[in-house]
Amino acid sequence: MPYLSLLLLFFFFSCSTNNPLRNVEEYKGPIIEIKDLNTLYSDSAQAKFKLKSEIYQVFESGEEKYPKGLNMDIFSTDNDSVSASFKANYVIKYEKENYFLATGNVVLFNYNTGDELRTEELFWYPNEEKFTSEKFVTIKTGNELHTGEGMVSNQDFSNYEILKPSGIIEVDEN
């Protein structure tokens, strides 16, 4: 008789709908995390970009994040010298759409011209080889300071346009 009551008790508790595995939350963190990333991208044996980041994360969705910032050197298309540099406090790459969104103290600098862009948000489209922003931008060129809303630039920041310029622009009358 005691075995029968134990057996009934076992069946009673084993039929419970309270499954502890059902309460486990799905993991949404990175599936890959690399510390002190230093990567060189090349195409047809020609250097394109050099990326440096304290932390690099890849998620199941394909998104890539640089939560502690990203520094990138952009190589010239005609030789292996660095023509521009880019840095930001936080960067995320949207894999499906193939663009990067950089936020927080974004700086884009061209070594050949000395021009420097500063903004709080910048989009990079590597397939189109261009940068864009819809936010307020400041561009320092020599002794001039250009400001405005929105900007479009080629990848090495040698050719750019401020979409809604503002401020004072010095004009040479000669």
What are these regions, as identified by a protein language model?
Residues M1-N174:
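Mature-chain termini and adjacent capping regions
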